[in-house]
């Protein structure tokens, strides 16, 4: 039994979302359009967790569909968004997705570290 418990604990630790891995994925996959602190092709992400979709300060490039979606960026909605933005909000403008659930969890863990808006 102890070996099974150790194996389960190791698997759980390996599967736990990792903000450092998420930051690396974010830098590789997201920074062509996004930044934590500056709007670009896409909106800045600092403070995204818990924010209403389509409301990042100073960003004017949102689709009408996203602005009207009523979504609040929580773990479940971010996961669905990153997996397939068009299915979640038809008519939105984001052109990429992350198919791997582990990568999505890591990116979401990283986004949570950007909780406070930079003033």
Residue ranges, per PLM feature:
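Sequence/structural segment immediately N-terminal to covalent heme-attachment motifs in c-type
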Residues: 16-40, 45
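A generic structural signal for secondary-structure junctions
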Residues: 38, 49-53, 83-86
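Soluble non-cytosolic domains of exported or imported proteins
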Residues: 20, 24, 39, 68, ...
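Short Fe-S-cluster ligation motifs
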Residues: 58-79
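C-terminal capping alpha-helices of c-type cytochrome domains
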Residues: 74-119
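Electrostatic cytochrome c docking/interface patches
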Residues: 2-25, 118
């Amino acid at each position: 039994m102890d070996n099974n418990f150790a194996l389960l604990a190791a698997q759980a630790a390996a599967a736990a979302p990792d903000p450092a891995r998420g930051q690396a994925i974010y830098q590789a996959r997201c920074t062509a359009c996004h930044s934590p602190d500056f709007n670009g092709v896409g909106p800045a992400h600092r403070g995204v967790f818990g924010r209403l979709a389509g409301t990042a300060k100073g960003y004017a490039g949102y689709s009408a569909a996203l602005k009207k979606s009523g979504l609040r960026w929580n773990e479940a909605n971010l996961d669905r968004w990153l997996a397939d933005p068009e299915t979640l909000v038809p008519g939105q403008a984001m052109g990429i997705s992350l198919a791997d659930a582990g990568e999505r969890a890591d990116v979401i863990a990283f986004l949570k570290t950007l909780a406070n808006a930079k003033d």
